């Protein structure tokens, strides 16, 4: 089992994704690269990786939720 992410990591990741729609995807490496350019030297490498990991998880969760809502409406 993995450790639970701190709420500040979740809050930062969700704000970044919501303020920049369409930039991030399901690829951790891509998200990490984009975040490193956005947050240049403002956070540690460990924190950057934690944020990128949660961004990836958050994107997957949002897409899964959208897909299940579409199926419930009978559109898929």
Curated annotation (Swiss-Prot):
Keywords: Ribonucleoprotein, Ribosomal protein. GO terms for molecular function: structural constituent of ribosome. The keyword rRNA-binding does not apply. One of its GO terms (cellular component) is ribosome. InterPro entries: Ribosomal_eS17 (IPR001210), Ribosomal_eS17_CS (IPR018273), Ribosomal_eS17_sf (IPR036401). It comes from the Archaea. GO terms for biological process: translation. The keyword Repeat does not apply. Belongs to the eukaryotic ribosomal protein eS17 family. This is Small ribosomal subunit protein eS17. It comes from Picrophilus torridus (strain ATCC 700027 / DSM 9790 / JCM 10055 / NBRC 100828 / KAW 2/3). The lineage of its organism: Archaea, Methanobacteriati, Thermoplasmatota, Thermoplasmata, Thermoplasmatales. The gene is rps17e.
């Amino acid at each position: 089992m993995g450790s639970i992410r701190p709420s500040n990591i979740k809050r930062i990741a969700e704000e970044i994704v919501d303020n920049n729609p369409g930039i991030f995807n399901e690829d951790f490496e891509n998200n990490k690269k984009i975040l490193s350019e956005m947050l240049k030297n403002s956070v540690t490498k460990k924190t950057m990786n934690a944020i990128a990991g949660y961004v990836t998880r958050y994107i997957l969760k949002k897409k899964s939720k959208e897909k299940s809502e579409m199926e419930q409406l009978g559109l898929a």
